[in-house]
Amino acid sequence: MCHAIEFIETPLFTRQIKQLATDDELLTLQRELIAFPDKGDVIQNTCGLRKIRMATGTQGKSGSARVIYLLATREIIWLVLAYPKSAKENLTEAEKAQLKKLTALLINEV
């Protein structure tokens, strides 16, 4: 049986994704996460954040954008960050520490 998934965007994600992707590209990502919510790789030391590749424009997934998300419950996915791969390959330990704090806040929201 299929269940509904609610996507909640952080304000930062909303600003970032508008610069990176079209509405259709974001919809494609959301459909992918509905089908496979745990598809993204877990990012160590962030309390469960995941990173997934997202195709944008004419670039494939490997060279385009990265989306950081939190599978908070079976019904709620927080879209936290989006950035071009060319700007950043991996998060720094300091960024992970900040995201870990944010993750705790987001989990308490649901």
Q: Each PLM stretch: what is its role?
A:
Residues 16, 32, 102-105:
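Residues that form generic nucleotide/phosphate-binding pockets
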Residues 1-24:
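Arg/Lys-rich, positively charged N-terminal/basic patches that mediate binding to nucleic acids
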Residues 39-83, 87:
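Basic/aromatic recognition patch in beta-strand/loop cores that engages polyanionic ligands
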Residues 9, 25, 29, 48, ...:
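Amphipathic alpha-helical interface surfaces
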Residues 12, 21-41:
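Compact soluble domain cores
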Residues 70-110:
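Enriched for short, Lys/Arg-rich terminal
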Residues 3, 28, 35, 48, ...:
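Sequence/structural signature of beta-propeller domains
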